[in-house]
Amino acid sequence: MNEIRSMTVLPAVRTDVSFVTADGLTLVGELALPEHGEPVGTLLFLHPLPTAGGFMDSHIIRKAANRLPALANIAVLRFNFRGVTSPRGTSDGAFGHGVDERLDFEAALRFIRERGLPNPWVVGWSFGTEVALNHATEHDVAGLILLSPPLHRTSVEALERWNLNDVPIVAVVPEFDDYLPPAQARERFAVVPRLEIIEVEDGKHLWVGETQTTRVLSEIVAKVNPAALPLPTEFV
């Protein structure tokens, strides 16, 4: 047996993908599928702030793609928002301040639908949570998972729109978050009574370290495929 570490890449069917937004931009990404059988669910990752170095390889997103198809039978779609570069390539366009990224999210969700991938959960991290909260309300998604939500670009009105549907929403909030620690998160999110807040003891905004990584991935799997828990820490 081998211990799962930061750079571990478990077996999956990985494909470089691209899709086009409604305003004509080509975005680049990767789709990772379970090696055998159909996935039980799909994660659509929305990455952290591009102007602060966020991209499709931000470590939690990369590790989810590297592990969860094998460990939890989950498909993972990750991509670069407009104007963002990673080793996969550069998406067309320029940073849209969380506004134009609506079209990026919609193009990614459309790609999931066209591929027939099941049960799409939107997973935003930091800036990605703002894109999800502001732009996913009118779309048919299985749920939202918000990692380290800062609520910098999300108004009370945008939050209240989530009361018009019954989509499950969970916010995974680190105890020592730099922008929205748990007490403030409970206050800000109170306008959406069904929203579940999970406070992660000793957690920080960037979820650095294997302990925090495993906790975050476990909270995601708990919503999408709880039968896969606990996540293995070793592989053959």
Predicted regions mapped to residue ranges:
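Serine-hydrolase catalytic machinery in alpha/beta-hydrolase-like enzymes
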Residues: 20, 25-33, 38-115
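Acidic catalytic loop of the alpha/beta-hydrolase fold
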Residues: 152-153, 175-180, 205-206
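Short beta-strand/loop motif that positions the catalytic acidic residue
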Residues: 164-166, 171-173, 177
